[in-house]
Design a protein with these regions (language model features):
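Short structured motifs
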Residues: 19-20, 114-116, 139-140
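Sec-dependent bacterial lipoprotein signal peptides
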Residues: 1-13
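Short low-complexity, flexible loop/linker segments enriched in glycine and/or proline
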Residues: 105-106, 144-147
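C-terminal/domain-edge helix-coil "capping" segments
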Residues: 13-45, 119-123, 146-153, 157-218
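General secretory precursor processing signal
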Residues: 7, 16, 56-59
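N-terminal segment of the mature soluble domain
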Residues: 39-134, 161, 165-169, 200-214
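Extracytoplasmic/secreted cell-surface and envelope-processing proteins
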Residues: 45, 138-143
Length: 218
């Protein structure tokens, strides 16, 4: 009987990908970056389906989420970025959003990459960060027992303004599962303190992971 009471608390995370990847050769370092408004990318079908990243074209299995999960991701990213790169000059918020909206509406025929490049150029930034949420499924239940665990998929890109190159990519795709289902996930188990986490908590874990390889300053 006691074993049955303990099992719901032994939880880890099942994941497909959890990485931050510096793409080009050589060291990438910026002093001033702009953070464009993060976006939720949802499939046309309400039950979910495949979508493509607006920047790199990679395919993700996505589901639409209520609320504004893109704002959650952007907030957590900015908080962690300030902690990890305190000397980095970051432009964010309405200042960037206003420029982004204007350039997007005035330039309907250009690609998303070109829009971001123009945004960065106008703001005097060397790089522009863009983030996309593909899945933000909240847990159904409470911290010690759930009907359905939290599941999160997101991707963050860093674009170099001078040539439009995507110089860094951080991707996170994770669904929490019991430790009994996957005994190799002790690290996630201890990070989550042996409980079923919320989608925001899982997103925070992902942001922390991908920012480990985010380019530094010159």
């Amino acid at each position: 009987m006691s074993l049955c009471l303990v099992l719901p608390l032994i939880v880890g995370c099942h994941y497909r990908e959890d990485s931050g990847i510096p793409l080009p050769e050589g060291k990438i370092a910026f002093d001033r970056i702009a953070v464009a408004p993060f976006q939720q990318v949802a499939p046309e079908e309400s039950l979910g389906g495949a979508v493509r990243c607006p920047l790199c074209g990679m395919t993700f299995n996505a589901t639409g989420s209520p609320g504004h999960p893109e704002q959650v991701l952007e907030r957590l990213f900015l908080e962690e970025l300030e902690k990890e790169r305190p000397k980095l000059n970051v432009i964010s918020g309405e200042r960037v959003a206003g420029v982004y909206r204007r350039i997007s509406s005035d330039s309907l025929t250009i690609s998303q990459r070109e829009v971001l490049q123009r945004v960065g150029s106008e703001l005097g930034a060397e790089g522009v960060v863009a983030g996309y949420v593909y899945r933000f499924r909240e847990r159904k239940g409470v911290s010690y027992t759930v009907e359905q665990p939290a599941s999160v998929t997101f991707e963050i890109h860093l674009l170099r303004v001078s040539d439009g190159a995507l110089v860094w990519r951080g991707s996170f795709d994770k669904t929490q599962s019991s430790l009994m289902e996957n005994l190799f996930l002790f690290a996630s188990f201890f990070r989550g303190k042996g409980k079923w986490v919320t989608a925001e908590e899982l997103t925070g874990e992902g942001v922390e992971q991908v920012l480990k390889t985010f380019p530094g300053q010159p």
